[in-house]
Amino acid sequence: MAFPIYLTYEEKEYDDGNQGSSGTEKGSKTKTDRINSGTALWRRAKSELKDDDYYEFYKQLSHDSDAPLHYIHTRAEGTMEYSTLFFIPKKAPSDLYNVDYKPGVKLYVKRVFITDDDKDLMPVWLRFVRGIIDSEDLPLNVSREILQQNKILLNIKNTSVKKLLSEFKQMADAASGTDEAKEKWETFIEQFNRPLKEGLYQDFGNRDAIQELVRFKSTAVEGWTSFADYVSRMKSDQKHIYYITGGGAVSGGEKTLRASPLLEAYRAKEIEVLIMDDEIDDLVIPTLHSYRKETPGADGKSESQTWELKAVNRSGADEELGEKKNKAAEKEAKPVIEKIKKALGDRVKEVKLSRRLHDSPSCIVADENDPSIQMAQMLKAMGQTSMPDVKPILEVNGDHPIVAGLKDIDDEERIADIAGVLLDQALLVEGIKLNDPAGFVKRLNRLLVK
């Protein structure tokens, strides 16, 4: 409330001095008590407030029965005068991924409520934030159209975003300290890692700061890891950050990616690969291209180092492993490659001899200029029916008995069945839904009979 509210009432008095006692009533007197604080909580000094004050206010503001995970209270004075009070929930709002989500930040002007339905008060990727913005400089009769173009509000928004990012970074840094701080940060990442990734795609101006916050799974460590942690573990001669995408809940997620044949060569060389198992990773990560980190130099000045991001499920990624082409092996495998190409026809973009496979007979990769099959399927599911079919590149292991055995087979139907199974199993192991599962079963049954 902007103004104090008082309640006036009559209080009876008794001759023994005790209210409500069995003594003789001797009269009454009028009393007046303040029933509110008189000052909006976000306008009060932080030194006057306790955690419980913030927690109770958050529950009233958000209708959340849980206390917030974190709160940030700021008072700015100078060229602009405003107060902000932001809360990070312990759990993601139920409408977080709805197009028609309800904004969580309310706008006040001079402690007078203006709106709680303006999605421009915060960037879309920070839609999980709850709280208050109270400006002293905006007019009270401000309209939605004016809000969208107002430089004062834009400055408050930009400053607030940087403040939130700074708080998130402090939470991340504190996670290496106490168990409580670690649990707090892990809760934050479990709930809001995906919106942060959206920020990488949507908020170019803050991309470097967001890159320090996003977390991924890894083939080298348990739990979450960051780009900074990855480069700290890199081999001295390693030039790239390797990652694999294409999981997602529909495709089997992290478990599917960890079992991918595409990782065999990296495991053999003990090279860490980041596991990016969220559907959004396929969209966001390729736009980053690289990770840049500032490090203190010998002269005290900061130095910048950049590492290129490389997807292991792209054609040509095996060349980065230092595996040299074996011309003799390619010459020997050429008749087999031609048989597979002829059998598969336009189901694939290309068939190649793989340098990355150790144990598996085949794998699929995407052309560098094509989206992944998983991304194409996701876009189609979202209604982009004009999305053309993406044809995979099939890589085969020339040393595997199934592939090598094709050299001595002349039966075209049998070659077609084996080639079809090599492709279908490569799709399945990546968690990709087959267009013709019945055809796969028929081919497999024919091979089992023979």
What are these regions (language model features)?
Residues M1-K450:
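Conserved GHKL (Bergerat-fold) ATPase module
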